[in-house]
Amino acid sequence: MKPEPLLRRGWTTGACATAAAKAAYAALLTGHFPDPVEITLPGGQNTAFTLAESALSETAAMASVVKDAGDDPDVTHGALLRVTLRIGPPGSGVSFHAGEGVGTVTRPGLAIPPGEPAINPVPRQMIRTAIAELAAQHCAPGDAIVEISIPGGEALATRTLNGRLGITGGLSILGTTGIVIPFSCSAWIHSIHRGIDVARAGGITHVAGSTGNVSETAVRALHHLPEAALLEMGDFVGGMLKYLKSHPVPRVTIAGGVAKMTKLAQGRLDLHSKRGEVDFPGLAAAAQTAGCAPEIIEPIRHANTAAQVFELASAHGTALGDAIAAQAWRVAAAVLEDSPTELEILLFDRTGTLQGRAGFAPVHMRKRLV
């Protein structure tokens, strides 16, 4: 068998912005742009970036870097990270401003307070460090006004969860290591965590994680939830639950399609099809335990889709969805352990019709419910 090729890593928006800021500040101090420009990542690695643009005037320098996400399907891949840098007033330090396409935080609960540009703490520190190092080399004060912009960023942001997090006007400048690991989906999981933070800061006591648009629409209608209570967890139920364990919310609903909730019931915390399919022999055993007619057990064992199984069970008068929801509840409750949370599981079909439910119960009761 031919081995799969290694996937190419990329660079975060924070790393790209740091490189552009360093090049711009160097130009203000020396009159020349370093190209390529080398930066040090938080882990100590040095890497160089080629400049896409550069311009220098008496009062400002502008440099830009094209975001390369490697082989990761990142919406910001190919975006232009542009930094315009001016010398700040004496003693002002480094200040940050959102230019075109960079968002502004409007809700509490994130690492950056409302009113500030959506430039996360690690990228801010990376930029401050790069400026401080250059300032020390050239005996300069190190005061700088840093404006970051991403042309087209506001349109790109509609393909992210920024709007739901209360980040308006564009994208966030992100990254904790400076490196994008392909298909780690760290940005999505990061957004889930920040969604929980925003909900908690807003006093929301009931959040709902959904696997997709159909289940989100259905659970929102069922519980009349505000948008800030909705967590687009996708396949990452494990990442959501682990964060909720240490950042609890009184009530949690997990809502999803029958196939993904069946995988949760079978113990999977990553619901992506690449991580594993529905175990149909296991589903047949669950159907038998739930009291499904004997004549459909073998067809279930050899079914092609979970939807087909639920249709078979429904046609023979068995509420298989409730049994699957109950088992999914036990799996999810085990992750939450003894957090002060009541948990609910909802299964929906493709039309948004409820197919199974395990109602709210405190997760500390899970041992009694097994």
Feature roles, as predicted:
Residues 1-159, 163-165, 360:
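Generic N-terminal targeting/processing segments that precede catalytic cores or assembly contacts
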Residues 107, 157, 218, 263-265, ...:
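Generic domain-boundary/flexible-linker signal
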Residues 342-370:
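Short, amphipathic C-terminal "tail helix"
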Residues 80-82, 222-226, 358-364:
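Surface-exposed flexible segments
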Residues 4, 8, 15, 165-172, ...:
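A structural signal for small-residue-enriched, beta-sheet-centric alpha/beta enzyme cores
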